[in-house]
Curated annotation (Swiss-Prot):
Transmembrane segments: none annotated. The gene is smpB. Belongs to the SmpB family. Required for rescue of stalled ribosomes mediated by trans-translation. Binds to transfer-messenger RNA (tmRNA), required for stable association of tmRNA with ribosomes. tmRNA and SmpB together mimic tRNA shape, replacing the anticodon stem-loop with SmpB. tmRNA is encoded by the ssrA gene; the 2 termini fold to resemble tRNA(Ala) and it encodes a 'tag peptide', a short internal open reading frame. During trans-translation Ala-aminoacylated tmRNA acts like a tRNA, entering the A-site of stalled ribosomes, displacing the stalled mRNA. GO terms for cellular component: cytosol. GO terms for biological process: trans-translation. GO terms for molecular function: RNA binding. InterPro entries: SmpB, SsrA-bd_prot, SsrA-bd_prot_CS. Signal peptide: none annotated. This is SsrA-binding protein. Residues 138-160 have a biased composition (Basic and acidic residues). Keywords: Cytoplasm, RNA-binding. Its main location: cytoplasm. Residues 133-160 are annotated as: Disordered.
Amino acid sequence: MARPRPAEFEKKKVVAENRRARFDYFLEQFFEAGIALTGTEVKSLRFGEGSIAESYAEVKDDQVWLVNSNVPEFSHGNRFNHEPKRPRKLLLHAREIDKMRNGVSREGMTLIPLSIYFNGRGRAKVELALAKGKKLHDKRDTEKERDWKREQQRLLRDRG
């Protein structure tokens, strides 16, 4: 019988988040991938530095790459520091890569990183989503819906 996992293994520490992704895209399918990082990149991420606001993932030659993500140079690094905007390889099973390739081949679909985090075991992970871009009227509808829900909560709170 397997031992239950300690609570510390279930925690995840979010380092970078793409907050605009949920507003700009319809998110369909979610994936979790490991990232191949250098030592100074890991240290920089542990300090909470890093941005995935304008990044995306692409499938090339049976591999998935995180493109245009920014992990600044480690402040205490020496001449062996990393390049901040280099493409980073994502670690996935072949079955997951096939799902991504098939999803991206559909018209208008893209792979968007939602967050970079360290899991309970201290491994850097990326949460990806297969997404389709929203049009302007879709964004307006989302905003109206969010405002209406907020107004409903306010009315219920004031009544009760």
